[in-house]
Amino acid sequence: MEPLLFNSGKANPSQDVFIDVEVGDITTKYGSTNTGSFSSMDTVEAQAIKAETARFMEVPQGRHLGVFSTVVLFVSRIMGSGIFAVPSVILLNTGGNKLIYFAIWVFSAAIAFAGLYLFLEFGSWIPKSGGRKNFLERSFERPRLLISVVFSCYSVLTGYALTGSIVFGKYVLSAFGVTDDSWSKYVSISFIIFAVLIHGVSVRHGVFIQNALGGLKLIMIVLMCFAGLYTLFFYKSTGQVAWDLPVTQVEKDSLLSVSSIATAFISSFFCFSGWDTVHTVTSEIKNPVKTLKVSGPLSLIICFVCYTMMNVAYLKVLTYEEIVSAGPLVGSVLFTKLFGPRVGGKFIAFSIAISAASNILVVIYSISRVNQEIFKEGYLPFSIHMSKNWPFDAPLPSISLCGFITIAWILILPKEGESFNYLVSMDGYGNQFFLLLVAIGLFIWRFKHKNEVPEIRASTFGVLAIITLSLYMLMAPFFADPSLNRVGFLPPYQIMSLLVIVACFFFWLVKFVLLPKFFHYKLLPKITYLHDGLIVTEWVKKPCLC
């Protein structure tokens, strides 16, 4: 068999890679040879080739994200809707106990830093777009393709910008004084369509608008910090607020339990969840290892300071009952009480809507890149079409899928106010499951490469803390009253997350194990060059006596 030649697009011919594996036919339609990554293959040799070629392969979009753009991506993803909506459910699940409330926020920040350095170390080993998808499939290579297919399917099915969209719709209506909450869904859907078109038509213009909204968000962060300082030193409440209660007091008839603390942590950790987002677009970052080493910790520090100031403001201005009853609109209630209905209720609500809009743009941008990497692997139907940078040299198909799934969830969700909390918990539970696997995978990777030193190294204690905490977070919801973890006709959030993961497992089992075994064929990867230089994989059937 003739070896296959992959040209790296470099002037040095020594960087050409010859692949001596059976992969099927290669298309002869070549475009730019600054190619993206290609999939996991059928042999150990192909995996080695993949690791070798990943060093110099580039995406067609090029490296255009510097430190500022990366900080904007981090901050915009982290600070979306969470701090304006989640404090209500956290205070409720901690029983109004301020000591536990602030301890959860501090602990969440510490785990976020540990998780950030976990990803920074993995990212220094594997500096390419895909994030945890790449980390998992390089760590868990057996059973063949299991982790790749399961995580890929799960990521596509849960690839939505939902929580930010819900908050955006609610706060836009609040800013314009609309009391009919049924319109919030249509506002959310309209902006999702706008975001899909912006990123799907032009990468450059999409990033420009994203950076502009991110800049406004940074200004908002400064204003929020000043609001926290103002309430701490100058604001005088007219009655007893949550801040005035004893620090260890638990409210009567509270829901405080092991399970409720786990739910509170999931909600709090959700507010920091964007620390792993930028690794999904590593191939578009200039000098990714050094850039992420600076922008990652800086972004988390900025967000933690802002969160602390905002939490002080909530407790200094509002009562326990006001915070809990406000739900996702707790941010609007705070600023209305601070600055009056005209400034606080309108202007601040509009500002929060801008923050949520920035978050939506970043989430859709990041998810579309993950989806594109997944479709390039060829596991799912229509992968060739969904992975294309078409028709405007931007991944419109994968962006559109993210928008479609988000809109579908918005339409399906019940109207109850608990829908937001349910989504946060469901999304957080699934992410916690895969974060556990990534943390375990780092130790596997270190063992395989024990003679090599990464450019960035995560704390072993921090990684062990993530593993321990993740196990606790995954088990705790099963010890609670199931009715507390569900909404409408949907099952408890942890069951919903696990059902999606199990469905992804059965997809792998049927397509890559059972059907080939029963019908006597094996699946081999056929590598295809797209017109823009992307390398994608198709899985073709080859008869065998297996």
UniProtKB/Swiss-Prot annotation:
Keywords: Amino-acid transport, Membrane, Transmembrane, Transmembrane helix, Transport. It is a multi-pass membrane protein. Pfam families: AA_permease_2. Residues 1-70, 120-148, 210-213, 276-297, 341-346, 415-423, 481-494 are extracellular. Residues 92-98, 170-188, 235-254, 319, 368-393, 445-459, 516-546 are cytoplasmic. It is found in: Membrane. GO terms for molecular function: L-amino acid transmembrane transporter activity; L-methionine transmembrane transporter activity. GO terms for cellular component: fungal-type vacuole; membrane. The chain crosses the membrane at residues 71-91, 99-119, 149-169, 189-209, 214-234, 255-275, 298-318, 320-340, 347-367, 394-414, 424-444, 460-480, 495-515. GO terms for biological process: amino acid transmembrane transport; methionine import across plasma membrane. To yeast high affinity methionine permease (MUP1). Very low affinity permease for methionine. This is Low-affinity methionine permease.
